[in-house]
Amino acid sequence: MAIILYGNRLSPFVEKVHRGLMLKQIPFQQHEPHGPFDLRRNNPTTGKMPALDLDGQRLFDSTLILRALDEFKPEPPLLSPDPPIAAQQRLLEDWADESLYWYGMVLRWNIPANTTRTIKLICKDLPPVVRPLIKLMAPRFVASQTRAQGLGRLPLNVLLQELDRHLANLVQLLGDGPFFFSTSQPSIADLAVFGQLGFLYSPVTPEGTAAVEKYSELLEFCQRLDAMTD
């Protein structure tokens, strides 16, 4: 039975799962959505990307999907055999998904020039009939989400200062590397952070790119993981 990943790699969560599949060398197909209705069709539980067909089941949520992949193919493992390190890896994965993600969202949707670039990037692969709907609804809807989350209420200079502090903290957690918590193999934490750093380091968010470029250690980390999962 074919393993199918549903979602577009512009999403850091789809990228996270894509890299996990590549790391484990699991053959799969990728189906990209052609509009918002495909999201609900592919993932009726949450209506979000990614979703994955695996072993006869339709899975959702990047964290749950990676957990299932570790059971489906245990090697290479996505968690350290050392329980304290594994606990830290789980926490970092959750932080990247639930906190760092929103810095990228604010930079994309709360700065008008970036919003224009983001919509152009999203719409280029969508059917023409869907594009006006995305252009009309997405900016207002997503910007309201960032304000409800909290980061969207911050002045840009404060947001960038906080982002810089978090990136500096990531360098400390990377330690001697090559992967987070000085481990020799990538884990769920590395996959999650990689996805979010790529989300920040994008032509549509020059502020995010500049923030990440300050830390050569993070760029080198991304290059290492990319080489293992490309």
Predicted feature residues:
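Structural signal for well-ordered, non-membrane alpha-helices
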Residues: 97, 167-171, 226
